[in-house]
Amino acid sequence: KPKHMASPKDIILEAPIGSATYNNEFGRPSIFGYFRTLEYKDYGFHKPIMLAGGIGSIKESLIKKSNPKPGDLVIVLGGPSMLIGLGGGTASSIKGQSNSDLDFSSVQRSNPEMQRSAQQVLDKFNSRNTKTPISFIHDVGAGGICNAIPELAKDCNLGVKISLANIDCHDATMSPMEMWCNESQERYVFTISKKKLP
């Protein structure tokens, strides 16, 4: 077993604790979960899968996304860009190869406190009696904002003008590529009319 890989025993004992810790800090505890493993003969390093989940609800008026209009603002909500998570989307898709340097540089770091703060902003928008001012929202996952913002633009059939100088960064020495492509956690991108921005 490669040294950087957790053993099945470690995953079984520690993974539920990690899930519960994050969700409890966020304020949405994990209320169910289970393990799954292959029951037929296989070859390689055996690694069980842990699944966890919770239950949520959504207002009927928020089920469908609206269509942003030309001139609407694109907002990046959540934590700053940090020099972490570069190559995570690639690392998670590689077959038959393992590069510990890539693995560790691509590991994302969770920040439940920031996630909770971002969620409270969205909750405030969505708790209004009138319709939410957010017209379109997209999570920031693999690829960071260099993936999320173009996907948002494609889904809206619009172009986007980006100013990297306006991207909040944790490290002032980050290159444009690092600012654009890092996969820092706890971020969303959404569109909103200039008139509706609080």
Please annotate each region the language model reported.
Residues 1-198:
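Glycine/proline-enriched, intrinsically flexible loops and inter-domain linkers
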